[in-house]
């Protein structure tokens, strides 16, 4: 990763079905995932050396229809499209832009962003796992490995892609 600068940005958003989602929920999700990302990258660009790498956090929900995830999924689809557009905008500076889309990852997020009880979160995790071809949720270190790859010289000819790290969840 010689000389590579990387900007990996956080994700946010709570889950709410269309029937009960509020304008505040929608605004918070888009303010963090779309507006916050856009202006953070804009302000960081003057600090980037030519030839750097920007890695955006999207989600497999950007290509899946998941009940309750509509606003979140739409915000992550916007993130995915930032990678496409910024790839073209930043090509003259040789800054590569990619997005990484995790699937179901074994973190506390399921319990903390959905309002589910611990027992309900475990049941949901088991249901997610049953829908993943690899039969399990991913590990945080697997996400880290994917981001490390995208930031490395080994991915020097990769830009504009959305790397799904999802155990096949959104692929089949």
For each of these PLM feature ranges, what is it?
Residues 15-18, 22-27, 124, 128:
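Substrate-binding pocket helix/loop in short-chain dehydrogenase/reductase
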Residues 99, 121-154, 158, 165-167:
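C-terminal helical subdomain
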Residues 15, 64, 148, 159-172:
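Short C-terminal tail/terminal secondary-structure segment
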Residues 1-9:
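Short, small-residue-biased leader/transition segments that mark boundaries at the very start
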Residues 59:
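Residue(s) in the substrate-gating loop at a strand-loop-helix junction
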Residues 46-47, 88-92, 156:
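Alpha-helical segment proximal to the catalytic Tyr-Lys
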Residues 41, 75, 83:
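Active-site helix of classical SDR
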């Amino acid at each position: 990763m010689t000389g590579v600068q990387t900007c990996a940005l956080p994700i946010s958003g709570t889950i709410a079905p269309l029937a009960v989602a509020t304008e505040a929920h929608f605004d918070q999700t888009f303010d963090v995932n779309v507006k916050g990302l856009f202006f953070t990258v804009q302000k960081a660009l003057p600090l980037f050396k030519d030839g750097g790498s920007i890695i955006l956090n999207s989600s497999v929900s950007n290509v899946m229809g998941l009940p309750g995830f509509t606003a979140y999924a739409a915000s992550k689809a916007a993130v995915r499209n930032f990678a496409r557009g910024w790839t073209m905008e930043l090509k003259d500076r040789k800054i590569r832009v990619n997005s990484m889309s995790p699937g179901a990852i074994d973190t506390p997020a399921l319990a903390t962003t959905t309002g589910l009880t611990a027992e309900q979160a475990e049941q949901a995790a088991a249901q997610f796992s049953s829908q993943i071809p690899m039969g399990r949720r991913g590990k945080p270190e697997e996400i880290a490995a994917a981001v490390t790859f995208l930031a490395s010289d080994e991915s020097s000819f990769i830009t504009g892609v959305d790397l799904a790290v999802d155990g096949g969840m959104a692929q089949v």
